[in-house]
Amino acid sequence: MASEDIAKLAETLAKTQVAGGQLSFKGKGLKLNTAEDAKDVIKEIEEFDGLEALRLEGNTVGVEAARVIAKALEKKSELKRCHWSDMFTGRLRSEIPPALISLGEGLITAGAQLVELDLSDNAFGPDGVRGFEALLKSPACFTLQELKLNNCGMGIGGGKILAAALTECHRKSSAQGKPLALKVFVAGRNRLENDGATALAEAFGIIGTLEEVHMPQNGINHPGVTALAQAFAINPLLRVINLNDNTFTEKGGVAMAETLKTLRQVEVINFGDCLVRSKGAVAIADAVRGGLPKLKELNLSFCEIKRDAALVVAEAVADKAELEKLDLNGNALGEEGCEQLQEVMDSFNMAKVLASLSDDEGEDEDEEEEGEEDDEEEEDEEDEEDDDEEEEEQEEEEEPPQRGSGEEPATPSRKILDPNSGEPAPVLSSPTPTDLSTFLSFPSPEKLLRLGPKVSVLIVQQTDTSDPEKVVSAFLKVASVFRDDASVKTAVLDAIDALMKKAFSCSSFNSNTFLTRLLIHMGLLKSEDKIKAIPSLHGPLMVLNHVVRQDYFPKALAPLLLAFVTKPNGALETCSFARHNLLQTLYNI
């Protein structure tokens, strides 16, 4: 390290925050590769008496630097809180496990008794979980109360490793007469899916002391949701349940509602964007009406709930004196339904509690019926472990005996919700196929899958591939529904491949303009147009990681894309796993 760099580092360290037993290097942007780089950090640690909390967020720590920092921690037995989120930026994934192993060994040697461990926003994947597995099983974590692993890309494998480690920690600590009493568990955006969630649910059921569970955006469907619901029922102290942006369907909604009936301490329920639909919402409303005396927030936004079910939910919160927010935005109430909902809440003197309804999707008489069919399809898929077998079985189950080759499947009699009883009532309905314009107006994975294999042809036919702005619009709408679910992922990438292959092969298509406009809409490049950036970059980044590896992608665009994805940006920081994967791919082009 050059002398001027050392001087700069020393100046940065001089501003290090020291308060209440806490030593903070948070957000210093330190690049600690070697032992020499970490020399001043180590000095600060060694000279700090009574160190209880160490903040390393917002720096980047290499293997060698981690080893010497760990050595310094071996004498810090009073350390209780490790705030180590976002501290491997720019590191190869292979560097992270050995760095974590070293740090964990330092804590174990010190005889520390941790209360909080935060490793969020480190894109370490399943192998990274192996890096702190031994720490979790050790006496250093027998006292752990808060475990935060948000946005780490653990996947199913990492979820299973984590669950086993927590179970072992509980077993060992129980043998010493002081069972692990974990209170807060955070693991959003980790692609846990059903198997990972189910494994963790088993661990939660054994632990039994949870007060907060945050697991949004994990691709969990109703089998995983049901497993979690069963585990939550054995955790009577639960106050916060955040499963935002997973796919409950009605089956998961009903299962979770049954658990809510048994809990008395719950204050916050966040099931937004979970597709509980009307039947699930009515079941949850029943649980709210009969209990949950401390409820402060109920989020059922963007769940495909219709008017009558939404009114049932509103009526259920009438006696919740502590309620601060009811969010039913983004459902299918219609203008009249929104007015009725506001009137109901106003009649309870709770108008201020109701969140905005500005994104209501409008009343659609056929949408509920389509949703019922989606539930059946999703359940058929989830019953099989192999993705390819899932798709084949689903096709077979949907195929009626009279179906001929090349014909559309006949629409059977379906059920819609009886608004009075909340029970399904049989009706006959005519087919309501989804067309591309419907999908592009309100994109969702279900609508994309309903288009079937023809989506690739349709998107090419109905998009002006000579116009970069129109291609960007179609690209972002398809990418927005990207999920790790095999069928959704395949449908998204097939549609994107067809669109981009046609666009890049068009002689009048300006590739540079396309990338520029894409970066603007993603909020990575400023524009005089004052275009509002899309809300989430996860889908577009995951899709771009696929696109840049295809033969049709002009490799001359890679350096420009790399430059903007590398630049610091708040929107990118919330998608560190997807960003890391794309950067790795771009570096290798």
UniProtKB/Swiss-Prot annotation:
Cross-link Glycyl lysine isopeptide (Lys-Gly) (interchain with G-Cter in SUMO), where in sequence: K8, K526
Residues that bear Phosphothreonine: T411, T438
Annotated effect of mutating H521A: No effect on UBE2I binding nor on sumoylation
InterPro entries: Leu-rich_rpt (IPR001611), LRR_dom_sf (IPR032675), Ran_GTPase_activating_1_C (IPR009109), RanGap (IPR027038), RanGAP1_C_sf (IPR036720)
Tissues expressing this chain: Detected in adult brain, liver, kidney, intestine, uterus and ovary.
Key words, A-Z: Acetylation, Centromere, Chromosome, Cytoplasm, Cytoskeleton, GTPase activation, Isopeptide bond, Kinetochore, Leucine-rich repeat, Nucleus, Phosphoprotein, Repeat, Ubl conjugation
One BP annotation, GO: nuclear export
Consequence of substituting L525A: Disrupted binding to UBE2I, and no sumoylation
Record note on disruption phenotype: Embryonic development is arrested around 6 dpc.
UniProt crosslink position (Glycyl lysine isopeptide (Lys-Gly) (interchain with G-Cter in SUMO2)): K8, K15, K279, K454, K526
Phosphoserine sites (modified residues): S24, S301, S358, S430, S437, S441, S444
LRR repeats (start-end): 48-71, 111-134, 207-230, 235-258, 292-315, 320-343
Residue ranges of the region described as Important for accumulation in the nucleus: 541-566
The family this protein is said to belong to: Belongs to the RNA1 family.
Official protein name in the record: Ran GTPase-activating protein 1
Gene that this polypeptide is encoded by: Rangap1
